[in-house]
């Protein structure tokens, strides 16, 4: 808001924020220091835009309309790899054209862990944290590229961009420093912070954290576009000559921060955006889906699709599959040109309402309240909300097996799924499959761990043929 709008009562009135106007005037008369503090926060708001986005999001959520089969259809899915993509991806890495970007703003609260998720240690041999595991994979991708293209410049690197939130920033940066950036040159690690949006009550009024502070929350993974621009990360990519960026969620323990095959596919097809998916098999599975709508890709939540569309099937090579089966696993490819354009249009992203229990300060009663039930909304934008700006011809939907690509760490051990134990088992099982595929000998109960320092995707294990492997770590 500009100075003129700040004291225009009609703007506060038409956007249901009179309590904010009244509090500003109260502090202006009674406490100038607190007034300036609150004023500085209000100046960051565009009340008209916020109110419009809130009303649109509210209307959409109340409408609760289900999409029919005529409104959404399957995207063309790439589910087999061209053998040339691996080498093409390694070539782009060797040329210094590739960067990794991790969305690491989440806390480990649901894991029973007091810290950023990326700092969580899985209990594998040598006890690496999630961040360290990803660093090992980045270094291995670079080593493979250098070996495949030894004539390229030796000083090339894979820069790692790490999006943190206000609550994870300090601890994440300290963790990297304490661990010497896990062997990656610190000049190749770029931390940047996602933005925040104000919390609202059920009627759309801004909530207060104190008498002179608004209640804020991270703005969702869609905040990546604006944050890349404002932090200087995009300028850094441009300076380095980055053309290809893979973005992923920190909590997928099987993730490949830089996947040569995926990058090779996107490079060969000259795509603006691509995403990895896994096949949805159960119509009742609660997962977002990549679909085509009006010749544009988009992600829809399971709750937005009619039962008829959810259960629709098609026959592929004599086997029945769900028609809408491309399940989103939050792993995306972006061309640098797309990110540049997206960063300039981030203000057009819609907001989504997450109903939560939000402690707040009541400026009328002057009491701080901790609610027992959900009382308001945290506002989020989603990274995939800009996907519809891309034509299906410039978008790639790449289907990968769950067992090799997706094992999210979401819950504590009290939950039967997506917990620490399931993640460790998935890592060990994948390594075991590589050993057996290469002719190694294992007992059924063996717990041998194949480190990313040894193999990224099962390559370079030919030496193990005919050898007995037992409960060890392969480096």
Curated annotation (Swiss-Prot):
Belongs to the UDPGP type 1 family. It is an enzyme of class 2 (transferase). SUPFAM superfamilies: Nucleotide-diphospho-sugar transferases. InterPro entries: Nucleotide-diphossugar_trans, UDP-sugar_pyrophosphorylase, UDPGP_fam. Gene3D superfamilies: Spore Coat Polysaccharide Biosynthesis Protein SpsA, Chain A. The modification Phosphoserine is found at residue 405. Pathway: Nucleotide-sugar biosynthesis; UDP-N-acetyl-alpha-D-glucosamine biosynthesis; UDP-N-acetyl-alpha-D-glucosamine from N-acetyl-alpha-D-glucosamine 1-phosphate: step 1/1. GO terms for biological process: UDP-N-acetylglucosamine biosynthetic process. UTP binds at residues 103-106, 117, 194, 220, 251, 378. Substrate binds at residues 221, 410. Pfam families: UDPGP. It is found in: Cytoplasm; Nucleus. It catalyses: N-acetyl-alpha-D-glucosamine 1-phosphate + UTP + H(+) = UDP-N-acetyl-alpha-D-glucosamine + diphosphate. Its EC number is 2.7.7.23. Its main location: cytoplasm. CDD domains: UDPGlcNAc_PPase. Keywords: Cytoplasm, Nucleotidyltransferase, Nucleus, Phosphoprotein, Transferase. One of its GO terms (molecular function) is UDP-N-acetylglucosamine diphosphorylase activity. A motif (Substrate binding) lies at residues 103-106, 301-302. One of its GO terms (cellular component) is nucleus. This is Probable UDP-N-acetylglucosamine pyrophosphorylase. Disulfide bonds: none annotated.
């Amino acid at each position: 808001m500009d100075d003129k709008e700040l004291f225009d009562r009609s703007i506060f009135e038409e956007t249901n924020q009179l309590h904010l106007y009244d509090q500003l005037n109260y502090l202006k008369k009674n406490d100038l220091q607190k007034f300036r503090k609150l004023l500085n926060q209000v100046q960051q708001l565009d009340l008209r835009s916020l109110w419009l986005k809130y009303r649109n999001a509210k209307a959409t959520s109340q409408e609760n309309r289900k999409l029919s089969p005529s409104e959404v259809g399957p995207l063309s899915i790439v589910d087999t790899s061209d053998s040339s993509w691996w080498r093409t991806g390694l070539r782009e890495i060797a040329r210094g054209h590739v960067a990794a970007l991790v969305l690491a703003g989440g806390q480990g609260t649901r894991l029973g862990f007091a810290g950023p998720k990326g700092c969580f240690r899985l209990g594998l041999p040598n006890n690496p944290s999630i961040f360290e595991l990803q660093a090992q994979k980045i270094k291995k991708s670079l080593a493979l590229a250098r070996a495949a293209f030894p004539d390229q410049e030796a000083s090339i690197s894979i820069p790692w961009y790490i999006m943190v939130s206000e609550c994870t920033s300090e601890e994440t940066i300290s963790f990297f420093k304490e661990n010497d950036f896990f062997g990656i040159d610190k000049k190749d690690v770029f931390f940047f912070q996602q933005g925040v949006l104000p919390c609202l009550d059920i009627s759309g009024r801004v909530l207060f954290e104190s008498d002179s502070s608004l209640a804020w929350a991270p703005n969702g993974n869609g905040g990546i576009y604006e944050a890349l621009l404002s932090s200087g990360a995009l300028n850094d990519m441009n300076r380095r000559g980055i053309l290809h960026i893979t973005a992923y969620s920190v909590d997928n323990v099987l993730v490949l921060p830089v996947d040569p095959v995926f990058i090779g596919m996107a490079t060969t097809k000259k795509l603006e955006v691509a995403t990895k998916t896994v096949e949805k098999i159960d119509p009742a599975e609660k997962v977002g889906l990549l679909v085509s709508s009006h010749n544009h890709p988009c992600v829809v939540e399971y709750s937005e699709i009619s039962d008829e569309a959810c259960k629709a099937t098609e026959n592929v090579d004599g086997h029945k599959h769900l028609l809408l089966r491309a399940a989103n696993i939050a792993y995306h490819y972006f061309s640098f040109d797309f990110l540049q354009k997206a960063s300039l249009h981030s203000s057009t992203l819609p907001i989504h309402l997450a109903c939560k229990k939000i402690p707040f300060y009541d400026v009328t009663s002057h009491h701080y309240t901790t609610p027992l039930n959900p009382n308001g909304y945290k506002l989020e934008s989603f990274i995939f909300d800009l996907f519809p700006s891309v034509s299906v011809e410039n978008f790639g939907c790449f289907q990968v097996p769950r067992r090799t690509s997706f094992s999210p760490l979401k819950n504590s051990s009290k939950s039967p799924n997506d917990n620490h134990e399931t993640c460790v088992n998935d890592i060990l099982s994948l390594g075991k499959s590589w050993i057996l595929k290469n002719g190694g000998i294992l007992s059924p109960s063996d717990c041998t761990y194949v480190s990313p320092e040894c193999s990224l995707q099962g390559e370079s294990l030919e030496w193990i043929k005919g050898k007995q492997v037992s409960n060890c770590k392969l480096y």
